[in-house]
């Protein structure tokens, strides 16, 4: 475990990009909670989160004004923290995850109600945008925050490689998946991810399909 200077680029986080993380919190009775939540890097020592009301994570953040962001690529950890709370033996004393490649501690700067027009949930005040300052960064092993756009590119390429081998119904499914993957890549992806998707789109259009 190495405590580093506070610079989120050390774990592959770029300003303006969104990353998939597991946020851990605790309540006043030190009952811990873990939940997969996207984090937007807004500077080398600042992040933004947008969390819907009704979650234990948001309740704990509002009451304690602090939380831990864990960096991991472990699919089991993401699954367990989505489907139910992690067992206590997964946590360190400071509420970080024992298996995390890296983690950073945050203190809340501000809380603001916000709802995007594109949200399926339209009720005002359903979500809270949390602006936070990173107070400590710990790297346990070489780590890079997970950005889901790369997985979307790989899925798109796998589907494209089968495109000429399937019937029209399956082709339409692949096109729908391309559109959804493009939406995600355009929202959270890097320049190279977007270029890759643009190349696939050009090839699909050559086949007279409109992705």
Predicted regions and their residues:
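Basic, polyanion-binding surface patches
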Residues: 1-211
């Amino acid at each position: 475990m190495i405590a580093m200077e506070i610079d989120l680029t050390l774990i592959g986080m770029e300003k303006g990009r969104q990353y998939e993380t597991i946020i851990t919190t605790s309540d006043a009775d030190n009952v811990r909670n873990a939940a997969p939540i996207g984090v937007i890097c807004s500077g080398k020592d600042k992040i933004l989160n947008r969390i819907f009301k009704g979650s234990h994570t948001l309740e704990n953040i509002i009451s304690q004004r602090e939380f831990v962001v864990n960096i991991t690529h472990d699919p089991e950890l993401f699954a367990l923290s989505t489907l139910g709370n992690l067992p206590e033996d997964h946590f360190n004393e400071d509420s970080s995850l024992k298996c995390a490649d890296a983690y950073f501690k945050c203190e809340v700067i501000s809380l603001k109600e916000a709802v995007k027009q594109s949200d399926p949930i339209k009720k005002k005040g359903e979500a809270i945008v949390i602006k936070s300052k990173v107070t400590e960064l710990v790297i346990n092993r070489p780590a890079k925050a997970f950005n889901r756009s790369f997985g979307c590119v790989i899925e798109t390429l796998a589907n494209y490689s089968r495109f000429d081998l399937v019937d029209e119904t399956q082709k339409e499914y692949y096109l729908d998946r391309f559109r959804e993957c493009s939406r995600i890549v355009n929202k959270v992806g890097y320049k190279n991810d977007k270029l890759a998707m643009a190349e696939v789109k050009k090839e699909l259009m050559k086949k007279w399909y409109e992705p």
